Amino acid sequence: SAASDVYKRQIKDWDSRWYARDEKVGDLIVEDNKIRKFVKKSLYGAGVPKIEIERSNDVVTLFVHCARPGMVIGKDGAEVEKLRLAVEALIGKKVKLNIVEVRNPDMNAQLVAENIAQQLEKRISHRRAMKNAMGRAMRAGAKGIKCCCSGRLGGREIAGVEHYHEGTIPLQ
């Protein structure tokens, strides 16, 4: 139940850090969403769990957290520059792009989930994909992990849900 969950604001920070007049907030939230979708799609293979956005008067600063920064930056920062120009073209504002490395990708829930999804796209068995991901997370030092896959698993006609868990998962 929600009552037994940890209060999220104590353990997580906002992904958008800016303040605006009331009439602009809606447009800026939509713009943030557009930026996130575009960057996530552009860097699909690089493992991007989180994109933080800060705004000052006329500059939008993006902090792109990624598992494989070399792939994002490219040779002499060419790929980063290409991405920055593409985002500038998308929103029509000046953009600063900072790449932040994710220290331990096997401990990041978003990256573990995306990794399982990529394996399912390659037609690997859902059981094996989940067990492999859970094993890697536990070896990386996680105290516990719970994993769930749902849908037409293995091409079945009737959709189902499969759960696996390992270690301790107190109160979420």
What spans do the regions from the language model cover?
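Acidic-enriched and Gly/Ser
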Residues: 23, 31-127
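Short, hydrophobic/π-rich interface segment
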Residues: 138-140, 148-172
